[in-house]
Amino acid sequence: MYAIIKTGGKQYRVQEGDIIDVELLNTDPGAQVEFGEVLFAFDGAKTQIGKPGIPNFLVYGEVVGTVKGEKVTSLKYKPSHNQCRKWGHRQHYTRVKITGIGSKRKGKEGNHGS
């Protein structure tokens, strides 16, 4: 089974056991997270398409830690003034391991892990 989730303004195709890097979340390593905005789900026989999201459907994950992305450098140069400025940036990401995909039921976690 796989699903397409939206978090941090980006979309990710995930299945159980995947490790993904998402925009920085304010959580500690080892914390459980739920992604509620599931846009698409496929379990091999049944396809669910959200409009825009699938109601009562969640993707569960566990925070592994925070990582930094690749360094992006920029350069600004003004030849007539003999002026040059160089700077760089490394974006912080949260690494999440997907632990389950399933529906959410009242009072229960749903079929978490299946």
Curated annotation (Swiss-Prot):
InterPro entries: bL21-like (IPR028909), bL21-like_sf (IPR036164), Ribosomal_bL21 (IPR001787). Keywords: Ribonucleoprotein, Ribosomal protein, RNA-binding, rRNA-binding. GO terms for cellular component: cytoplasm; ribonucleoprotein complex; ribosome. Transmembrane segments: none annotated. One of its GO terms (biological process) is translation. It comes from the Bacteria. GO terms for molecular function: rRNA binding; structural constituent of ribosome. Part of the 50S ribosomal subunit. Contacts protein L20. This protein binds to 23S rRNA in the presence of protein L20. Belongs to the bacterial ribosomal protein bL21 family. NCBIfam families: L21. This is Large ribosomal subunit protein bL21. The lineage of its organism: Bacteria, Pseudomonadati, Chlamydiota, Chlamydiia, Parachlamydiales. The gene is rplU.
